[in-house]
C-alpha cells in the first residue's frame, strides 16, 4: 500500500490533469442525464398496475388529463370556453355538460381536458402552458400540472438550496477545522467527486427526480468525514517526518483501512435499497452508493496531492482548534446510568411498539392550491380505470356498473355500454341532433330499427341524406359528429380490452381511498370471467401500501444483518458490534416515534432511506468511539478510558454529523417538493438522534459491559 501511496503523492500533477479532463467530460454528462418524473416506471415487474398501464397504452395510446376550472362564466361563455379549449393544439377532447353539477356548480365551471400525449411529454406541457398563458383566471390540476410544478420547483429550488447548504457546511468546517484553508480543500475535493458521480449518471437509462434532487447533497454529507480522517492522520505523521510528502505517503498508507472500513458500511447500507421490489430503491441505491465510492476514490487519489501542493497555505492559515472537553460529561453519564439506561429502554420499547403507526404517504408530492380550490368547489374527482376483456358478457358489465352507481362514494361511471353504446328512440335522437321527430321516425323505419345508438343513427342519416338536395350543411354536421363519436369510441373500445372510467369521491390516497379501491377490485374479481386490470393513482398507491410493511421490514433486516457482518469483520468484536447495531437501530425507531407523535404524514421512501443511511453512515460514529475506547483500555481503567475516548471522537462525530444534518435540514426546509423535503428532514432528525445515542447512550452501555465489549477475536490480550 505504501508503494501505491508514493505513486499517488509523487505523480500528483498527472493525477490533477486526469481529474481535470474527467470533470470536463462529466460536466457534459450532467446535461445529458435523463431525469424521470414518472414513479409508475419503478413499479415491480409483476405489478398489476404496471401491466394494466402497458395494456392501456397499447390499446388506447398515450393520453393525459388536465382539469380546468373557471369562476363566473355566463351560459354563452361556458360553451365558448369548451370550444376554445378544444381548439388548442394536442387537445384530444374536452368534457363539459351544462346544467350538470359534475361540471357546473355555484358559478364554477369545470372542464375535463384530455391531451393526446402522455403526462410527462413536452406536448402535454405545451397544452398546460397555453391554458395558463391564455387564461390568467384558470384553476388547473391533474398529473400534468403536478409534473410541471415538480420540474419547475427543481429548477428553482435546487440552486438556492445548494448555495445555502454550501454556506452552512463552510461555517461548520470553519468552526471545527484546524486551518482556514482546509474547508476549501475538502469542499473542492468532494465537489470533484460529486461532478464525477452526476456525470456518470448519464450512462444509466435515467435517474429519478428524487435521486437527482438529493444525490449531491447526501453524497456531500455522507462522505466529508473521509477527508477529515485522512487530514487528521496527516497531522499526526507530520510530527514524525520533516518532508510533507513522506508524511502524506505514510498518512495515506495508514488511512486506507479505516477510511475504507467506514465507507464500506455506508455503501452496504445504501446498496440494501437495491433489493427493494419498488425499483426507486435500485435507482437511489446505485447512484448514492456510486457517489460514496467516487468520494472514496477522490479522497485516496486527489486529496493527498492537493494537500501536499497547498501545505504551506494550510500551515500559514492555522488557527486555534476548537476543543470540546467530554471527560466531565462522561463522568456524569456513568453516574446517572441507573436513570439514563432504563429511560432509554422504555423510550425504545415504546418506539418499537408504535413504529407501524406512522402515517405513510405514497403519491402526493405537492400542495397544489388550485387543486384544493377545485376540490372545495366540486368535491373529489378521483378517476380510476378498469380494463376488461371485450368478450365479457354485456350483462356482467351492466350489473357491475349498476353496483358501482349504487355506491355513495361514486361520482360517475363512464363505459361504452352506458354512454355511446346506449340506444335512443326517434324522439330522443331528434332532440339530440336537431331533426324533426318525423324525419327521425322515417329514418328509423327505413333502417328497420326501433332504437339506435348514436353511431348507428349518424351512419344511417348520412347515407340517407347523401342524395337529398341542399343537405350539405347537415351532412357536414353529421360528419363532424361522427368523427367525434369515432374518436370517443376508440378511447373506450380496444382490440382486446374495453375501458371503463370510474370517478370516486375520495382523495387519491388514504385509508378510505385504498379501502374503496379494494372493494372495487374484489367485486370485479367476482363478476368478470376474463383478465382485468385497474389503473390509476389510487390503485398504484394501494398496491404500494399493501407491500410497504413487508418492504420496510425486509430492508431493515437486510441492513441490520449486512452492517452487522461488515462491522464484525472490520471491528473483530461480536458483542460490541451487536451493541453498535442495536444503538443505531434504536435511533431509527426513536426517529419514527418522533414522526408518529408529530402527526405528520411522511413519504414512504423517507422511512426506508433513513433506515439505510442511519445504519450505514451514523454507525461509523459508534465505531470510532468504540475503537478509541478499546485502545484506551489497554493503558487505563474504564473510567478514564471512556472520557479520553470521547474526547478523541467527539470532534469528528460532530463535524461529520453536523454536515449531514446541515445538508438535509437545508433541503428539508427549503424544498417545496414534499417527498424530497420529508425525506431530508427525517434524515436530519434521525442523524441528530443517532448522535445523541452515540455520545450519551453508547458510552454508558460500553462502560457497563466493559469486559464483553472489549473482547476482540483474533487478537492477543
What are these model-derived regions, one by one?
Residues 1-35, 119-361, 527-717:
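Membrane-embedded transmembrane helical bundles of large multi-pass transporters/channels
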Residues 11, 85-91, 135, 336, ...:
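Acidic-histidine catalytic/liganding microenvironments
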Residues 39-68, 73-77, 337-463:
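Juxtamembrane segments of multi-pass membrane proteins
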Residues 50, 54, 76-80, 84-175, ...:
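Extracytoplasmic
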Residues 90-97, 411-414, 601, 634:
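Short secondary-structure junctions
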Residues 381-383, 410, 487, 494-499, ...:
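Active-site lining segments that contact anionic ligands and/or coordinate catalytic metals
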Amino acid at each position: 500500500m505504501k508503494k501505491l501511496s508514493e505513486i499517488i503523492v509523487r505523480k500528483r500533477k498527472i493525477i490533477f490533469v486526469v481529474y481535470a479532463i474527467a470533470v470536463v467530460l462529466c460536466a457534459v454528462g450532467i446535461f445529458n442525464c435523463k431525469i424521470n418524473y414518472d414513479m409508475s416506471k419503478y413499479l415491480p415487474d409483476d405489478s398489476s398496475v404496471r401491466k394494466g398501464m402497458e395494456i392501456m397504452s397499447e390499446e388506447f395510446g398515450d393520453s393525459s388529463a388536465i382539469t380546468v376550472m373557471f369562476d363566473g362564466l355566463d351560459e354563452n361563455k361556458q360553451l365558448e370556453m369548451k370550444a376554445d379549449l378544444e381548439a388548442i393544439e394536442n387537445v384530444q377532447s374536452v368534457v363539459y355538460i351544462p346544467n350538470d353539477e359534475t361540471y357546473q356548480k355555484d358559478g364554477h365551471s369545470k372542464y375535463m381536458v384530455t391531451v393526446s400525449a402522455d403526462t410527462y411529454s413536452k406536448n402535454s406541457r405545451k397544452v398546460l402552458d397555453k391554458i395558463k398563458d391564455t387564461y390568467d383566471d384558470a384553476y388547473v390540476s391533474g398529473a400534468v400540472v403536478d409534473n410541471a410544478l415538480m420540474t419547475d420547483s427543481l429548477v428553482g429550488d435546487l440552486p438556492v438550496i445548494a448555495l445555502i447548504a454550501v454556506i452552512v457546511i463552510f461555517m461548520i468546517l470553519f468552526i471545527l477545522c484546524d486551518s482556514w484553508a482546509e474547508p476549501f480543500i475538502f469542499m473542492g475535493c468532494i465537489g470533484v467527486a460529486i461532478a464525477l458521480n452526476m456525470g456518470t449518471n448519464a450512462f444509466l437509462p435515467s435517474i429519478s427526480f428524487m435521486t437527482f434532487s438529493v444525490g449531491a447533497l447526501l453524497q456531500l454529507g455522507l462522505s466529508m468525514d473521509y477527508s477529515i480522517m485522512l487530514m487528521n492522520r496527516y497531522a499526526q505523521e507530520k510530527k514524525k517526518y520533516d518532508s510533507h510528502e513522506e508524511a502524506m505517503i505514510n498518512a495515506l498508507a495508514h488511512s486506507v483501512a479505516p477510511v475504507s472500513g467506514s465507507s464500506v458500511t455506508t455503501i452496504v447500507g445504501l446498496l440494501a435499497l437495491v433489493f427493494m421490489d419498488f425499483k426507486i430503491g435500485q435507482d437511489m441505491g446505485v447512484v448514492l452508493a456510486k457517489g460514496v465510492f467516487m468520494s472514496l476514490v477522490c479522497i485516496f487519489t486527489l486529496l493527498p496531492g492537493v494537500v501536499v501542493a497547498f501545505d504551506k497555505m494550510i500551515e500559514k492559515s492555522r488557527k486555534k482548534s476548537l476543543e470540546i472537553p467530554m471527560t466531565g460529561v462522561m463522568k456524569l453519564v456513568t453516574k446517572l446510568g441507573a436513570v439514563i439506561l432504563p429511560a432509554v429502554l422504555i423510550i425504545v420499547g415504546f418506539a418499537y411498539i408504535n413504529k407501524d403507526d406512522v402515517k405513510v404517504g405514497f403519491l402526493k408530492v405537492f400542495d397544489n392550491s388550485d387543486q384544493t380550490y377545485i376540490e372545495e368547489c366540486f368535491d373529489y374527482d378521483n378517476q380510476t380505470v378498469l380494463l376488461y376483456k371485450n368478450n365479457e358478457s354485456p350483462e356482467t358489465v351492466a350489473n357491475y356498473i349498476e353496483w358501482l352507481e349504487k355506491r355513495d362514494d361514486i361520482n360517475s361511471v363512464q363505459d361504452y355500454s352506458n354512454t355511446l353504446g346506449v340506444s335512443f328512440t326517434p324522439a330522443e335522437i331528434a332532440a339530440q341532433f336537431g331533426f324533426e321527430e318525423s324525419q327521425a321516425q322515417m329514418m328509423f323505419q327505413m333502417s328497420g330499427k326501433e332504437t339506435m345508438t348514436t353511431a348507428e343513427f349518424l351512419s344511417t342519416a348520412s347515407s340517407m341524406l347523401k342524395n337529398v338536395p341542399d343537405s350539405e350543411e347537415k351532412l357536414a354536421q353529421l360528419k363532424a359528429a361522427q368523427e367525434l363519436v369515432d374518436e370517443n369510441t376508440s378511447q373506450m373500445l380496444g382490440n382486446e380490452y374495453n375501458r371503463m372510467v370510474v370517478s370516486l369521491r375520495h382523495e387519491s390516497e388514504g385509508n378510505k381511498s385504498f379501502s374503496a379501491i379494494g372493494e372495487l377490485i374484489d367485486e370485479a374479481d367476482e363478476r368478470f370471467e376474463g383478465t382485468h386490470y385497474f389503473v390509476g393513482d389510487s390503485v398504484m398507491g394501494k398496491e404500494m401500501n399493501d407491500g410497504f410493511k413487508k418492504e420496510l421490514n425486509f430492508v431493515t433486516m437486510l441492513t441490520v444483518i449486512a452492517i452487522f457482518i461488515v462491522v464484525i469483520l472490520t471491528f473483530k468484536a461480536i458483542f460490541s458490534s451487536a451493541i453498535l447495531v442495536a444503538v443505531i437501530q434504536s435511533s431509527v425507531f426513536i426517529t419514527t416515534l418522533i414522526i408518529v407523535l408529530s402527526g405528520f404524514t411522511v413519504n414512504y421512501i423517507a422511512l426506508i432511506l433513513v433506515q439505510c443511511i442511519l445504519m450505514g453512515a451514523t454507525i461509523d460514529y459508534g465505531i470510532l468511539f468504540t475503537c478509541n475506547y478499546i485502545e484506551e483500555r489497554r493503558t487505563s481503567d474504564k473510567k478514564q478510558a471512556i472520557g479520553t475516548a470521547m474526547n478523541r471522537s467527539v470532534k469528528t462525530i460532530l463535524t461529520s454529523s453536523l454536515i449531514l444534518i446541515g445538508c438535509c435540514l437545508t433541503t428539508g426546509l427549503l424544498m417545496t417538493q414534499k417527498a424530497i423535503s420529508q425525506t431530508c428532514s427525517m434524515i436530519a432528525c434521525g442523524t441528530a438522534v443517532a448522535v445523541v445515542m452515540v455520545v450519551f447512550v453508547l458510552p454508558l452501555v460500553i462502560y457497563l459491559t466493559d469486559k464483553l465489549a472489549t473482547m476482540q477475536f483474533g487478537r492477543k490480550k
